[in-house]
Amino acid sequence: MEQSRAQYGRKGINMGNIIGDPFALATVSISMLAWIIAFISSIIATTQVTNDSGSFPPFAWWTVVYMSFVIAGVFVVVASDTAQTYHVALTGYLGAALALNSLTIHSLIYSANGARQAAGAGFILMAMVTIVWIFYFGSAPSAKPRAYLDSFALQKESHSRQMMYGGGRPETSTSVQPPQMYTSAQLNGFENPSPVQGISTTQARNSVVAPTFNATPPATKGPGQDQEVVPPTEYPYRAKAIYSYEANPDDANEISFSKHEILEVSDVSGRWWQARKETGETGIAPSNYLILL
């Protein structure tokens, strides 16, 4: 867990997050191309000022500058895999970008000048991509349209991961540390006093006082309690991570995982799923960060 958390902390801009995602690659590429068309056409239209056409609208230049920052922001957010963190702010900026593009299109598209019409076409393309981005980043990760778009990137990443590890690695991985060893150690403190009253309660309390706050199970546990932990948990389901997740350091049961990572899941009920990684590490993972295969 510490190793995975360290890898998560070192994660920065990764071009694989864009190249491996067809949706991100297509929309970012189209927006960049549209911005170049609008920028070059605006320069040409500025030099072609006539008495009939009038001066080039200065408002369009502000839209060009604003869209350059918006496109760069989307690129950085997607490449750094931080959409879950900044999707609210990004949606707000995209909403303002749509309004600016609409006003600029209205002031350019009806002109008889060819350069202005070309600039208007570039702004139209940027507006179309902006609408798609607003729908994508404004939707919850569990939304079917967004999950469908993310599934293309996940399948591509899954194929490359299987080729790298020889294929079928998650199916043959074994759990070295069953998660019940940690769960039962925490639950025994609550389960022992409940069915036993009177003298047995004091005996159980005395047996727990010495090993309190130890990471390993207490030495006074009977063999019957260890037998409950021995049977391994089966993981009939498989899931893929939509986003990266860093485990809470205060909760030893959580596990960290990276985006597009394949996990094995034992139970899909509730908000937290019992999962197992390819390395054999087990723990609980938030269900809204995973998608079932």
From Swiss-Prot:
The keyword Ubl conjugation does not apply. Gene3D superfamilies: SH3 Domains (2.30.30.40). Residues 234-293 form the SH3 domain. Residues 45-58, 110-117 are extracellular. Forms homooligomers. The chain crosses the membrane at residues 24-44, 59-79, 89-109, 118-138. InterPro entries: SH3-like_dom_sf (IPR036028), SH3_domain (IPR001452), Sho1_SH3 (IPR035522). This is High osmolarity signaling protein SHO1. Keywords: Cell membrane, Glycoprotein, Membrane, SH3 domain, Stress response, Transmembrane, Transmembrane helix. It is a multi-pass membrane protein. Residues 1-23, 80-88, 139-293 are cytoplasmic. It comes from the Eukaryota. Plasma membrane osmosensor that activates the high osmolarity glycerol (HOG) MAPK signaling pathway in response to high osmolarity. GO terms for cellular component: plasma membrane. Its main location: membrane. It is found in: Cell membrane. Glycans are attached at N51.
